[in-house]
């Protein structure tokens, strides 16, 4: 980040109410106080010299043609980022949206079509339809891209894959990218198997990182650039947060996706998403998605269990045991794992399914991924900004 090269200062807006964290003693680590003066990157955009100097500031707003990668989480106080930019006179020309769409209502995996925002009339281009990367044609009339999505710190949550493709497209066209940083609600630890890119790379896992990587989306963008996971270097600026502490709780003001509705589900998500590669359900279509696991009438109810402060295989291994018992009693019972390789894509390794089927303990399984995890932690340190 080099803010000196940026000469433009956005017009001051009316005071925006800062989002702040709320306590949740289930997490077991220190919450932020309401008066901690916390501010997201989007809130810090105002008054910072962040727009590229090649574009001139003119009275009435920034006239460089700006594309925004955003969804329902892209808020400045109680106002959407796009509305905030337009009120400031920024020349927003189009919106790119990720999985779940601009309003965050599309189901997981559902195709998101291009559309028009009824409020602003701006075109919305889907990055979760037939193409997941902005095309040269879509960027030909763009001078700058703003990226503002709320991540949850898990490798298989696809917003970081969208970030990868946006960075790649911007780098190829020489377009500056500005990432507005936001907290990682699972940012207080690093754990899980590191993805094997040779065998398990997909849109639910593109980089050699563990399931829980303990970085903000801004830090992750720096790592994509620094580790050369894209061919060309992206002209990247990260607008930092104020008073963000990795070990503090941050209750998201807006649900990041339809099935992560509260802090408890978000904390369980790293542990339960692996079930998406099995014949178990994780509560989709109910009032408690990612707070329980089902296999037929067998239920693992986690709604009232203290939110985990670390990644664990205990839920997966417990349900594997229960399904084994049920299958022994019924020849019609479905196998635990799906026949496809989706579990491997989520786990990031071909080994985990085999290890569980072989009856290995969690401690022994962990020992197999520890060397790669330790190596990642050292790499990660280079890109931490908080």
Regions found by a protein language model. Give the residues of each.
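Bacterial Sec-dependent N-terminal signal peptides
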Residues: 1-26
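Short N-terminal or domain-adjacent regulatory/targeting segments
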Residues: 23-65, 72-78
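Short internal beta-strands
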Residues: 91-100, 180
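Glycine-rich, charge-decorated loop segments at or immediately adjacent to ligand/cofactor-binding or catalytic sites
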Residues: 104-109, 178-200
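Glycine-rich oxoanion-binding loops at beta->alpha junctions
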Residues: 112-142
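Glycine/threonine-rich flexible loop motifs
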Residues: 151-163
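Conserved anion/nucleotide-ligand pocket segment
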Residues: 200-271
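Conserved functional hotspot residues or short segments at active or partner-binding sites
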Residues: 294-367
């Amino acid at each position: 980040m080099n803010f000196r090269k940026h000469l433009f200062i956005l017009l001051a807006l009316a005071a925006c109410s800062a989002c702040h964290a709320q306590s949740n003693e289930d997490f077991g680590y220190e919450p932020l106080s309401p008066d901690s003066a916390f501010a997201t990157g989007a809130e810090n955009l105002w008054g910072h010299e962040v727009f590229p100097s090649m574009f001139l500031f003119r009275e009435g707003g920034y006239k460089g043609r700006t594309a925004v990668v955003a969804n329902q989480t892209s808020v400045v106080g109680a106002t959407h980022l796009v509305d905030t930019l337009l009120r400031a006179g920024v020349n927003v020309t189009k919106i790119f949206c990720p999985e779940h769409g601009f309003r965050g209502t599309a189901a997981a995996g559902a195709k998101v079509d291009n559309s028009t925002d009824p409020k602003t009339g701006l075109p919305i281009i889907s990055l979760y339809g037939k193409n997941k990367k902005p095309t040269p044609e879509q960027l030909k009339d763009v001078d700058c891209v703003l990226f503002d999505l709320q991540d949850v710190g898990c490798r298989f949550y696809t917003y970081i894959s969208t970030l990868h493709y946006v960075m790649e497209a911007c780098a190829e066209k020489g377009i500056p990218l500005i990432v507005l940083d936001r907290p990682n609600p699972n940012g207080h630890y690093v754990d899980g198997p590191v993805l094997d890119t040779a065998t398990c790379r997909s849109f639910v896992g593109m980089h050699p990182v563990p399931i829980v990587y303990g970085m903000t989306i801004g830090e992750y963008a720096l790592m994509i650039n620094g580790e050369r996971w894209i061919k060309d270097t992206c002209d990247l600026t990260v607008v930092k947060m104020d008073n963000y502490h990795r070990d503090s709780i941050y209750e998201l003001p807006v649900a990041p996706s339809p099935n992560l509705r509260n802090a408890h589900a978000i904390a369980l998500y790293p542990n339960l998403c692996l079930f998406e590669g099995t014949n178990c359900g994780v509560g989709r279509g109910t009032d408690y998605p990612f707070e329980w696991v089902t296999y037929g009438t067998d239920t693992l109810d986690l709604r009232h269990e203290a939110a985990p402060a670390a990644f664990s295989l205990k839920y997966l291994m417990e349900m594997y045991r229960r399904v084994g018992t049920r299958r022994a009693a019924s020849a019609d019972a479905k196998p635990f794992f799906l026949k496809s390789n989706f579990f491997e894509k989520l786990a990031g390794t071909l080994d985990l399914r085999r290890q569980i089927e072989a009856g290995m303990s969690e401690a022994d399984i962990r020992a197999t991924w520890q060397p790669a995890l330790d190596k990642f932690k050292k790499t990660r340190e280079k890109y931490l900004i908080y």
